[in-house]
Amino acid sequence: MVQMASDIERLYIDEEVRDVFLQAYEEDYERKSDLACDVVDCGYLLPPVKCIMDNGDKCYKGGVVDNKGNFVASSRHWRGGISGAMLEGYPFSMSEASFEDIEVLYGGILINHFGHFLVEGLSRFWYWVQNKEKNFDVVFFNPKHKKIIPQFWEFMEILGISKNKVHIVSSVTRYRRIYVPEVSHQISTYYHKEFLLPFSYISSKIAARDSDKIYLSRTKFNNGTLCMGEELLEKVFKENGYQILYPEQMSLKTQISYIKGAKEIAGVIGTATHLEVFARMGTKSIILERSDTPIKEQALIHQAIQANWYSVGANMNPFPIEHSIGPVLLGITENLKGYANKCGMSINSDMIGYVKKSYARKFLKLYMQPVSYTHLR
């Protein structure tokens, strides 16, 4: 019988922050309670309106209210803090609301970021999967009125929900019946067993590729956090038999087909590694950490899919950085060398600690700027 590694043995992280990572990975994120779905007859959808708290935090008012104007608590939007939350409705004229004589499934706030839509935007769709025969129309809010990400429509297509059954609600609207499922997941906080239902259903519609070992690269990704030096990591994994993939150059179906077929998945932590929600139970996952702060959402996903996971420090940042802002310096670290030695990978020891001068200069230049530089290249 093969003995599984303990959590501490899975961490190839600098000693001074290892306990922080260990705590994140030892946390139990699963909630055992049953989920429910509120059914609201002749209820109203109130598009979110922005409000500013006394401390400056921005939040929303809106959601679902019943035919007496009472807020339906299960329609709230909560991400662990008041910023961006939607916890109550607001006064409105029932007589002026438009009426749609259809039954709809409430999807909540549509987050126009692929990674966040992936793990948050489908958290109510467990009920859709369990009740496919109802052929629901679905309703979402788009409070920032941004162009909807193409992956949203790809998800709807794979689920079998046509565009004419998707409603982005922008004015107060009454519906014959609104189904309001509880969320199956709160980012970085908890998940229910139903969390994986939409992903399992989507995955069942797509044939797996015989991809064995894959590396999800960011080197051709021109948005999001600036990461410099990943080409060195990519080279290491390519030389050790991993197929290099560039997710942003693939359709969603193609990405899922590779994830579904892979026995081992490696990559710098981010949206691409969150795609492991489509992986098989027990898949090996090698997460290359880009900061000294653990991303609890990845630990949550690992628990949900029972991953054979490893967390490997790959950042060369001379100063503390914020995961979602950067800039990030990546390279071949002693941590990666330690993982390679343990798992039988070959690595060029001469490259340990190497950073291109141009990357170092760019890091310092951007780090000292007092403005956001997330999308600078």
Language model features: what each stretch is:
Residues 1-376:
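The feature primarily captures lumenal catalytic ectodomains
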